[in-house]
Structures are given as structure tokens and as C-alpha cells.
């Protein structure tokens, strides 16, 4: 723990967590949150998080550092429109895009045949409830982020309570309405009362709920590092992986349910773009160990483990994670003092897209709310359009 952390920890333990029977003082002292904001007027991300925790936040979207640590990309709608909207009509046609048809289809999220501002709107956070998400969590019985045919059929059997062999519209509406009850075997859900303030403060300073550092900014050089692969056979240096293709850098850990839930999306991205981009994951500190902010949703799928105390223990957990999620790209294990995860602000989960020159072209928001594979894919597609040579036109 650095000096800043120790200072804040002292403030917290000497004020907020004082015993209830402490005799009243004649003059009220300033609240810890007021002291923090006065001491750090620039209000860095970790201060925003600590202040909100002290004020009773349960770390929902838009609270703490989540309102500051939003995604950054070169490929905003304004930047993309300025580059590709040749006729100035406020949209980008297939002809104006002049790239791969499959890439255009990926960017055209509303399937209207044009690229427009709504296609670039990823403002809903990654855990925003939807019928599709509810169906996914109901089906993903083992919590590995992928729904198998057997799991999908299991949902049908569970919902067909009358044994009629079919489901009605109302059956599905009741099961997967955002306001109605539905089965959630693997969905991320804290205890009904929520974590205590002390649990959240410990999680903050242990860097379990996130790094105290903000990480590199857009267009900055990606900090170099060298880590061992999860099997211990190779040492991989980031700078050796940079160029000629874009590099997708993934941070995550096993006890982060939202990270696990995105495993299928991550694997599909890798399968689709593995010939055009390099994928590397860094395994970081556990977000929800049993000796920290434990989650009942982890218990339901058998992901129960304490925070690793040694590098070897972290490697063992990382191997379980890779085996369960079945990732087919290099997975590196961060040092036990979180040297890479802290520098990149990678805990509990985060994406970076690094261009062939080694600079950050896209940086996701902090996980879990900012951990959006589809948003990453959009920036990847547009970076590929810039970095790949155009296909030669076919002569008639």
C-alpha cells in the first residue's frame, strides 16, 4: 500500500469506522469525504470511488469512478463521420465505407444499411437488464459465459412446467421481463443487503474492485511488460507482440461474474479476428474472493476461492479459469503485486486496443459496467480499415 493509500486508510479508520459509543466532541469534524475532496481537488478516480463508498454507495453504474472512467476511442461517431461521410448527409453508406462488406455489417448495428450515430451509441452499461441477457443467465448453468445446446434445452424444460411441449408468448414474457422473476443461476447478484462499507473499502485498497491508478490514456504508448504464460512455458513481452497487426489486450479474473459472462463473446471475437489481430489476456487479482466481497452467484456455479497469496496460487487459479472458459489465445499471469494490472487499471476487467505503432487506440471503461466486447469490436473494425491495405478492385 502506497502513502496515498495509507493516508486515506488512516482517515477512514479514525473517523468513519469509529466506535458508536465514542463520546461526542464539542465541534463537529469534517467528514472523511470532505477531507479527501479538499486534499485532492483534481478528484482522481480512486478518490471519487472512496468518497462515494463513504457516502453509502453500493458501486452502481454512474457512481464512484464509473462516472469518470468511461471508454475512450479514436473512432467516435464524429471522427468516423468526418473521415468517411463524403457527401455530408450525416450517414455513411456502404460505398462511402469502401471496406469489407462483413465489417460494414458489423458496424451497422441497427441493420438499416447505413452507419449513423445510433450505431455508435454504447451508453447502456454492460449489465443493463434485457430479455436476451436474462435468457442467457438462465441458461448458462455452469457460469462459463457460453450456452450449450444442452443448457438451452434445460431452460425449455424448466419453463415448460405443464409438460405441454411448447412455450407460449406469455410464458417467455413472464420469465424474461426485466420487472418480473426469472431464474438466474449464474447472474452477478450481491447479497440482498449489499456489501458493507468496510468490505468495499478493503476491496478498494486491495485493488480487488479496481486499480487505484487510471491506466494509460488514449493515444499514449502502451506500457511495456513481460509476464509468463499460464502454462509457465513462455515469457511474453508486450512490445514483441505490437505490430504489424492490432493487438487486443484483455484483463480479467475468475471470480468476476460479469467477466466470465463475456467469455463467449470474447472467444467469438478471437475466432473471427484472429487472422487480422493479436489477442493477449492478462490474468489479474480476484474481484470477489471468499475472503473479500464474496458473491452468492459465484457459490451457485462453484467458483469459490480465496485471494491468492502467492504467485503460484494465482497461476493455479488462472489455469482453472482458462480451462473453464476455454480460451484459445495466450493468457499471461500478473505478478502477485499486480504490477501490470495496476499500471493498466485492469482490475477487475478491461479491454485495450493497441495499434501497430504501440499506442492505445481504444480503452474500455472500468469493469464490470464498461466491459463491452461489442464496443471493442467496433473500434477494432475501424482500426483494421485504417491499417490494412485495401483489397485490389476486380477488373470486369
Describe each model-derived feature in a short phrase.
Residues 198, 202, 335-396:
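Thiol-/selenol-based redox modules, centered on thioredoxin-like
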Residues 250-256:
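Aromatic-flanked redox-active Cys/Sec active sites in thiol-based oxidoreductases
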Residues 15-24, 396:
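Bacterial Sec-dependent signal peptides at the C-terminal "C-region" and cleavage site
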Residues 226-247:
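A short beta-strand-turn-helix
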Residues 5-16:
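Bacterial N-terminal signal peptides
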